[in-house]
């Protein structure tokens, strides 16, 4: 015969505890026995599981009523208040009333009352104890904010749920902003965990569908002469050959360096060129710019004189 677990005792609350009292006790115990606070402590880990199981039942009114029925039954329910002599009175587990004068089987009066009849008492003795139902699997939903690189690569991630549990889950790669993924049997009592992925802002990249947009600074000489420059991608630094005569704001494309779609095909990286002037040119650089000025034929203000 399977014994009914007393979740009130596990959480250290009375049977008539309010929902707020139950939550307060749960949070206190969850912090005390949390695996992060007690690493490699199997006893604390089991206690933490018991606390979560108890809170799952006691925080649900339907499950709590079912637990009360199995724990206390019809005749084993403990009294919560004294009864007046005029009331029917409560019954203790041995079939006698809690207080008041009673009539014995011989017809005499005594200081204790028997149950309503010997038949009632006999029926109580024959009552079958019902085994508790197995914990019902419950799905859990949670939000998870990740940096772009982590969402792209995937891997292990530790998450903390609102009920106090901490889980380490293996995340798949290529998760987009707003995507909802299912982690089997990571919920409560074997249910599933549904995670909504939110991507945190990135200092360099902006996700545009499966394309990744970024700005890349170049020097005046690189813009004029072209050549190979280094560009950061979510895979790391790559060499990119840019054409001569780059304009500020011009956009180039790095094929297959974007974010993957559901089929695993990657988008492109969109590179916007930003021509930057050296803030503190050296004397040699200044001399070269003077010589260029003497030789250059381009006048960007010529259009002002065309009117």
From Swiss-Prot:
Biological process (GO), any one: chaperone cofactor-dependent protein refolding
Keyword annotations of the record: Chaperone, Cytoplasm, DNA replication, Repeat, Stress response
Stretches the record annotates as Disordered: 69-133
Stretches assigned to the J domain: 6-71
Entry's cofactor comment: Binds 2 Zn(2+) ions per monomer.
Ranges annotated as biased composition (Polar residues): 88-99
Listed InterPro entries: DnaJ_C (IPR002939), DnaJ_domain (IPR001623), HSP40/DnaJ_pept-bd (IPR008971), J_dom_sf (IPR036869)
Compositionally biased tracts (Low complexity): 100-114
GO molecular function, one term: protein-folding chaperone binding
UniProt KW Glycoprotein keyword: no
Cofactor: Zn(2+)
Alphabetical list of Gene3D superfamilies matching this protein: DnaJ domain, Urease metallochaperone UreE, N-terminal domain
GO cellular component: cytosol
Top-rank taxon: Bacteria
Compartments (UniProt record): Cytoplasm
Function: Participates actively in the response to hyperosmotic and heat shock by preventing the aggregation of stress-denatured proteins and by disaggregating proteins, also in an autonomous, DnaK-independent fashion. Unfolded proteins bind initially to DnaJ; upon interaction with the DnaJ-bound protein, DnaK hydrolyzes its bound ATP, resulting in the formation of a stable complex. GrpE releases ADP from DnaK; ATP binding to DnaK triggers the release of the substrate protein, thus completing the reaction cycle.
Assembly information from the UniProt record: Homodimer.
Official protein name in the record: Chaperone protein DnaJ 2
Source organism of this protein record: Synechocystis sp. (strain ATCC 27184 / PCC 6803 / Kazusa)
């Amino acid at each position: 015969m399977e014994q009914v677990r007393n979740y009130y005792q596990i959480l250290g609350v009375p049977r008539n505890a309010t929902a707020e009292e139950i939550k307060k006790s749960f949070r206190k115990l969850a912090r005390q026995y949390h695996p992060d606070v007690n690493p490699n402590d199997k006893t604390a880990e089991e206690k933490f599981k018991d606390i979560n199981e108890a809170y799952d039942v006691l925080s649900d009114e339907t499950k709590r009523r079912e637990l009360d029925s199995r724990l206390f039954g019809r005749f084993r329910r403990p009294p919560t208040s004294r009864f007046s002599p005029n009331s029917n009175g409560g019954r203790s587990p041995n079939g006698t009333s809690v207080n008041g004068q009673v009539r014995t089987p011989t017809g005499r009066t005594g200081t204790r009352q028997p149950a309503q009849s010997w038949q009632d008492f006999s029926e109580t003795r024959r009552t079958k104890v019902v085994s508790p139902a197995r914990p019902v699997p419950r799905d859990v939903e949670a939000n998870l904010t990740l940096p772009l690189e982590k969402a792209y690569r995937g891997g292990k991630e530790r998450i903390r749920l609102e009920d106090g549990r901490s889980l380490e889950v293996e995340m798949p790669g290529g998760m987009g902003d707003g995507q909802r993924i299912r982690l089997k049997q990571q919920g409560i009592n074997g249910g599933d965990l549904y995670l909504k992925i939110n991507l945190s802002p990135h200092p360099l990249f902006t996700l545009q569908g499966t394309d990744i947009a970024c700005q890349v600074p170049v020097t005046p000489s690189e813009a004029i002469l072209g050549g190979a420059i280094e560009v950061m991608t979510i895979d790391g630094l790559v060499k990119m050959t840019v054409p001569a005569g780059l304009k500020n704001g011009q956009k180039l494309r790095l094929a297959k360096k974007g974010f993957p779609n559901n089929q695993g095909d990657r988008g492109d990286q969109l590179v916007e060129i930003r021509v930057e002037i050296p803030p503190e040119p050296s004397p040699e650089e200044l001399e070269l710019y003077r010589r260029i000025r003497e030789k250059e034929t381009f006048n960007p203000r010529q259009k002002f004189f065309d009117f």
